Amino acid sequence: MIVTKKQTCYTDLISRILTLDIAPGSMLDEKLLSDEYELSRTPLREVFQKLAGEGYLNLQENRGAKVSSMDLPNMRNFFQSAPMIYAAIARLAAENANERQITALKMAQKRFRMASENSETREMAMHNHEFHRIMGDMAGNPYLSPSLNRLLIDHTRMSQMFYKPVNSKERLLVWEACDQHDQMIEAIEKADPATIVELTMEHWELSRGRIEKFVRPDPLDMDLGMQEAGE
């Protein structure tokens, strides 16, 4: 299958947005991207329109394309909605998954575990995104899928913090999350919706605290500030 420049631009921009290579709220430079991907204005704008429809960008009249922000109202909506959406998707996935989808989920988990073993933050975040996107495919609900996909955009961006552990305790959390994926796959194979909903909520709570630190970091050391002021 031949991959066009337009397809390359589309998939690459998704990756760059999800991994924070392009920061939330950034305006995209149409001329720069046109040169980088060797696309004329019309196909590039078609890529922007597709990404906007999926929640990655906001198109502003006479101002161009802006990466979806992660401001306070958005984050509030994220933390309110995530548990409900993840639980509903998980239940439907356990009820509706087919063998082909389960195989795809196992492959995504294999890639996620390999990235975890190699401490590859970017790859862990992207493979986790893939894992939960496949669960959305399993659910097969046209009303929930757009909500899940939009949720995953912000979750993946914030998970850069979770997948960059700074001590042994945080590294153990990453491994626990990896093991929970295996347990979720097992529950799906057994068509056990009650178990997977419980696992999904545990999975959410495991990462929630670390994700919150992304938008609410620890305050600066007051003693250090006072010391610098006195010098």
What do these predicted regions represent?
Residues M70-R76, A90-A97, A115-E120, K164-L173:
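A ubiquitous short alpha-helical element
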Residues F78, L105, M124, N128, ...:
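Hydrophobic packing residues in well-ordered alpha-helices of helical domains and bundles
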Residues S81-A97, E130-E170:
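Hydrophobic, amphipathic alpha-helical faces that serve as interaction scaffolds
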Residues M84, K110-M114, I153, R157, ...:
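Residue-level marker of structural boundaries
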Residues N118, Q160-E231:
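C-terminal all-alpha effector/ligand-binding and dimerization domain
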